[in-house]
């Protein structure tokens, strides 16, 4: 029965997003179909984050699971006992303040996520300080950006062994220990504050995933326009520019009370993308997204995108691979000991390369074997042989000789070129 449930669970995972169009390949992709062990589409080879997959409760569960067995556990348990989902992203509808006039229709903006604060004015200002193309307004480019970063920065297979491909019991145990360690030592959630709220003692606040928000509204702070442009004693930990009194700032508990960030500066130190939903990992005085924190701790398989917990793995082309996943990107044939060619940083076996990627010789019109020498000029190639690299007029061998290229033809002299004109 356990095996049956596991197989069913795996099948459901592969059904998620099935048929969703690719935003990158457009009509060239028949629709999203998850590869059996790679985290890509079988049809177009793009990742799930490149497809228009609707966010489901699975994303909420993924983020909620991230906070299990942390200091937030008791709060999560209370939310569950109250009948509230373990995690629910903070969808917020913000009202335009100028719309309060009589006979003026109310103008609202729906965000798919907003910072967990009670004060709408503070949340609105936080959003306005983000680049417009990254503001998660429902149905916008920014919402698509957030969805993509959720998949990229917080992959489920970095926290849940059941989302990985055929881990051994030892690997499962080691992964569980690794996840437990980063939850206790590195994982955190940013909190939106006003600089004036930061005192020597530090705020005694706790982030509640999906429940009531513990950050109190800043009374009168947003109405005091005169304070908005005054510098404070704080400077942004990222850009080093001073923080303004009336502007929201992000505080990260693991970094300490002496560090604040502008909303647009709260980014991963490796990929420099906004930390999605302000979820961060702190290490060596730097912010990381989940993916790049894990990359700094463990090798990642370039085939399946999972972290490697096996004692034996291979390294090739400055990348790491599970032994069973060092395969041809086209046919999935294992490449150990075989000749392969790198195409767009992906290994391809020799037969697949010749079939799908090899350049065609202008002389014999056959594919050029990757191990064979060739002559290339602009976008044209020839076998470097006495049978192929010849004058297009008199058939004189041009290897080691001067030649005159004309589109796909080559000539040994002006005379031969004129004769073919």
From Swiss-Prot:
SMART domains: LIM. Residues 155-164 have a biased composition (Basic and acidic residues). One of its GO terms (cellular component) is protein-containing complex. Keywords: Cell junction, Cytoplasm, LIM domain, Metal-binding, Repeat, Zinc. Residues 133-164 are annotated as: Disordered. GO terms for molecular function: zinc ion binding. Belongs to the prickle / espinas / testin family. This is Testin.
């Amino acid at each position: 029965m356990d095996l049956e449930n596991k197989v069913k669970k795996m099948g459901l995972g592969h059904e998620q997003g099935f048929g969703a169009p690719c935003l990158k390949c457009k009509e060239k992709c028949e629709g999203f179909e998850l590869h059996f062990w790679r985290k890509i589409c079988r049809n177009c080879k793009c990742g799930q984050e490149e497809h228009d997959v609707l966010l489901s409760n699975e994303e909420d569960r993924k983020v909620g699971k991230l906070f299990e067995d942390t200091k937030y556990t008791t709060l999560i348990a209370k939310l569950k006992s109250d009948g509230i989902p373990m995690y629910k992203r903070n969808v917020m509808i913000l009202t335009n303040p100028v719309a309060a006039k009589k006979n003026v229709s109310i103008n609202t903006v729906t965000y798919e996520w907003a910072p967990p604060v009670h004060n709408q004015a503070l949340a609105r200002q936080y959003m306005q300080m983000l680049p417009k193309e990254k503001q998660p307004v429902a149905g916008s480019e920014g919402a698509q950006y957030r969805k993509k970063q959720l998949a990229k920065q917080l992959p489920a297979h970095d926290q849940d062994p059941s989302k990985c491909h055929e881990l051994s019991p030892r690997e499962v145990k080691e992964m569980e220990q690794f996840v437990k360690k980063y939850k206790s030592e590195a994982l955190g959630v940013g909190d939106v504050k006003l600089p004036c709220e930061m005192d020597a003692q530090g705020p005694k606040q706790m982030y509640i995933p999906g429940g009531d928000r513990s950050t109190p509204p800043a009374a009168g702070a947003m109405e005091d326009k005169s304070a908005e442009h005054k510098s404070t004693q704080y400077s942004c930990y990222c850009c080093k520019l001073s923080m303004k009194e009336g502007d929201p700032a992000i505080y990260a508990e693991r970094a300490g009370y002496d560090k604040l960030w502008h909303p647009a500066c709260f980014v991963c130190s490796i990929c420099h993308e906004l930390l999605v939903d302000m979820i961060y990992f702190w290490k060596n005085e730097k912010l990381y997204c989940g993916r790049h924190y894990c990359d700094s701790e463990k090798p990642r398989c370039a085939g399946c995108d999972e972290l490697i917990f096996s004692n034996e793995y291979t390294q090739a082309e400055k990348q790491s691979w599970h032994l069973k996943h060092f395969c041809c990107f086209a046919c999935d044939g294992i490449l150990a000991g075989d000749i392969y060619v790198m195409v767009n940083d992906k290994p391809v076996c020799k037969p697949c390369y010749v079939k799908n990627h090899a350049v065609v010789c202008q002389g014999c019109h056959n594919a050029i074997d990757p191990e064979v020498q060739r002559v290339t000029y602009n976008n044209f190639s020839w076998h470097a042989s006495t049978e192929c690299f010849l004058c297009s007029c008199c058939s004189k061998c041009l290897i080691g000789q001067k030649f005159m290229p004309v589109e796909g033809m080559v000539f040994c002299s002006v005379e031969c070129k004129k004769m073919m004109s």
